[in-house]
Regions:
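Short, small-residue-biased leader/transition segments that mark boundaries at the very start
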Residues: 1-3
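Substrate-gating cap/lid alpha-helix
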Residues: 7-41, 54
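Hydrophobic, well-ordered secondary-structure elements that form the walls
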Residues: 25, 61, 146
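Short, well-ordered loop/turn and helix-capping segments at boundaries between secondary-structure elements
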Residues: 31-34, 43, 63, 67-71, ...
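Short beta-alpha connecting loops at secondary-structure transitions
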Residues: 41-50
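Short, surface-exposed amphipathic charged segments that create phosphate/polyanion-binding patches used
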Residues: 50-59
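Surface beta-strand/loop "capping" patches
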Residues: 56, 63-106
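C-terminal beta-sandwich/jelly-roll accessory domains of carbohydrate-active enzymes
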Residues: 98-173
Length: 173
């Protein structure tokens, strides 16, 4: 629960007020013409939404501005678009993806999956065909929802080929 100032947190893994705030910012960026949003999942502090590292956000914002002004097609922030379930696995496709997805480590801790009971379990995630995720956990026979990096602060493992982090997401079938 977000009791403290919105930009501060206790570093609790299950605390997701920043994730909700990022989601609302993304929705606004899709509704307002000539705006965009970058993901800062690759930098930040566990207890403060404003990263001390200003260079990384500046570089991401520069790429976004270039794409908006010069109508370039590079991927700045890939966002989860569609989710479908097949044979006990969830598949996620992405919007704004003009290059391949890359898992920077084999660690898939930022991924969680649930069934209809809404109990989330750590999940295995694999990039397939360079543009889709396959997410599963053998304990979840009929998956219906997935989270990626859905917390205030934590490790980001999913990037585009050019090194831009994929936006955290929470999707249901």
């Amino acid at each position: 629960m977000c009791i403290r100032d919105r930009y501060l947190a206790d570093g609790e893994k299950d605390d997701s007020c920043w994730a909700l705030q990022r989601e609302q910012q993304y929705i606004a960026s899709m509704m307002i013409q000539n705006t965009g949003m970058i993901s800062l999942a690759d930098c930040g502090e566990y207890d403060n939404i404003h990263p001390l590292d200003k260079k990384t956000p500046g570089e991401h914002l520069f790429q976004l501005a270039k794409n908006l002004v010069y109508d370039r097609q590079g991927t700045i922030t890939a966002t989860a678009a569609q989710l479908f379930s097949d044979n006990g696995k969830l598949y996620v496709t992405f919007d704004h993806l003009h290059e391949k997805l890359v898992m920077q480590t084999a660690d898939s801790r930022p991924f969680e999956i649930s069934g209809e009971d809404n109990i989330f379990y750590p999940a295995k995630a694999d990039v397939i065909h360079g543009n889709m995720l396959c997410i599963s956990n053998s304990a979840v026979k009929f998956p219906s929802a997935v989270k990626y990096a859905w917390y205030n602060f934590g490790e980001a493992v999913l990037f585009t080929e050019s090194g831009n982090p994929v936006s955290p997401f929470f999707k249901s079938v």
